[in-house]
Amino acid sequence: LKLMEMNDNHVEYHTVKEFLTFCVDGPDAPGAGTWKSTFPGKYLEGGKEAGGQLVDQRLLPRIDEGEVRILMAGDTCQMAIHKKPLDGLSAVGGNSAYTYYKPTDEKYKKMIETLYKDIPTLLPAMDLQGEPLPLLWTADYIPKNPEGWSKAENADDSETEYVVGEFNCSCVGISKFQ
């Protein structure tokens, strides 16, 4: 397997067995191989109740263009933020250039309207029906070409689709809250 750590963009090569051992028992476990990652692995430790989880998420190559974070207060968008990584693929960890947009800005207005339309289905889909929306939360979108795209160049803005890569209410990055 070719694995990329999205926090610092380093690449490691491991067997499936080494990767699974890392995920279940950690980098120092017998059979895990040698890891450069600073993460402790053991992603399933404690089960769902303790937050143990592993997300199978495909790599979207257009992440190098950045991601769009929609900053929400309850059910109201406060701003859209384009986070463009300065190096590598990942906008994680603050090594990015940030551009801020008002919710009414045409660039992301349709995305925000779609999120508003989808809000009633979000909590039930996450088995949180009946719970209130978080006071402050974000939805991070990653650009992608439409399925079946065969052209050498990427889709233009009018054809680009977006995939939600994360909903977050624990570390929302509000340093530029307006």
What positions do the PLM features span?
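Phosphate-binding site of ATP-dependent enzymes
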Residues: 2-132, 140-157
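Glycine-rich phosphate/pyrophosphate-binding beta-alpha loops
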Residues: 83-90, 168-177
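Protein kinase-like catalytic core scaffold
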Residues: 78-79, 163-165
